[in-house]
């Protein structure tokens, strides 16, 4: 079993008492602004709430206001799968573009460029899979530009 000690004592955007737990009550957690370290054209367009963190996975809920977009980018250390919970977005993955509606799911593999434009206020649940087992360290680096508290 994963223990809080094996994961460290800090996960960006996650309450420290939830680290390594089998059940995390999302309803008592607040969303926080994310300013990714790959951000150049964006101003922290997502508000995120980490729902679960393990050595290989980060699961979070993200809200993006209508009209906001990130620049085309890729991740060298993880794959992502997202479930569109609310709102519509235009998702470009590699050379393909999709209009994603509530209930749709999409995947952007590790190393594949992608961009996400919100056509309406939108909420997605995203799972990031880190095959090397460095999920928490990588997530904390990604969120390094954000104003967050431990």
Model-found features: residue ranges?
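A short, N-terminal "cap"/entry segment at the start of jelly-roll beta-barrel domains
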Residues: 1-56, 71, 141-150
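Conserved short histidine dyad/triad with adjacent acidic residue
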Residues: 44, 58-76
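Short strand-coil-strand connectors
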Residues: 55, 92-96, 119
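Glycine- and acidic-residue-biased ligand/ion/polar-headgroup-sensing regions
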Residues: 77-89
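A cytosolic small-molecule/anion-sensing beta-strand core signal
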Residues: 85, 102, 120
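Structural motif
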Residues: 88-90, 97, 113, 123
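Short acidic-glycine-tyrosine-enriched beta hairpin
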Residues: 94-111
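Ligand-binding loop in jelly-roll beta-barrel domains
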Residues: 110-136
């Amino acid at each position: 079993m994963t223990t809080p000690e094996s994961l460290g004592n800090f996960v960006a955007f996650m309450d420290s008492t939830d680290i390594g737990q089998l059940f995390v009550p999302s309803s008592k957690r607040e969303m926080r602004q994310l300013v990714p370290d790959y951000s150049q054209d964006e101003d922290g367009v997502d508000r995120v709430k980490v729902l679960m963190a393990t050595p290989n996975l980060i699961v979070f809920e993200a809200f993006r206001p209508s009209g906001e977009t990130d620049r085309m980018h890729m991740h060298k250390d993880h794959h992502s799968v997202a479930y569109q919970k609310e709102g519509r977005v235009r998702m470009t993955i590699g050379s393909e573009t999709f209009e994603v509606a509530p209930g749709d799911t999409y995947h952007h593999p590790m190393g594949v460029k992608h961009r996400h434009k919100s056509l309406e206020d939108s909420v997605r649940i995203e799972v990031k899979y880190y095959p090397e087992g460095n999920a928490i360290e990588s997530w904390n680096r990604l969120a390094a530009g954000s104003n967050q508290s431990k």
